[in-house]
Amino acid sequence: NSSSAATSGNSSSAATSGNSSSAATSGNSSSAATSGDYSTATATGGDCSAQVEGKNSLAIANGAHSKARGVLGCYLVLTEYTDGGKLLCAKIAKVDGTAIKENVWYTLKNGEFEEA
């Protein structure tokens, strides 16, 4: 019941469904999305986005001005870069419904999760 998809190139997208599925993209403005439990969505590149809709899943967005979102119980991994492309920090947070809300886009700003 698992599936995988991978794409590269600016404005690329990958989407999968099924438990333990994975979607990966690279390129500016790329997006990755999964809708199965225990799944992973990974996007890299400036202005990229990752979203997960299954329980116990992981959304990883690595790039300047990247964003991620997920449902309750999922984890979001985000990075923050300088305008010159230097990595400032990487952080992970659990979507708990309070500090990190369900189905809300987040980005890192000054090292903290902030609604995008």
Predicted regions and their residues:
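Periodic small-residue-enriched repeat registers in elongated scaffold domains
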Residues: 1-116
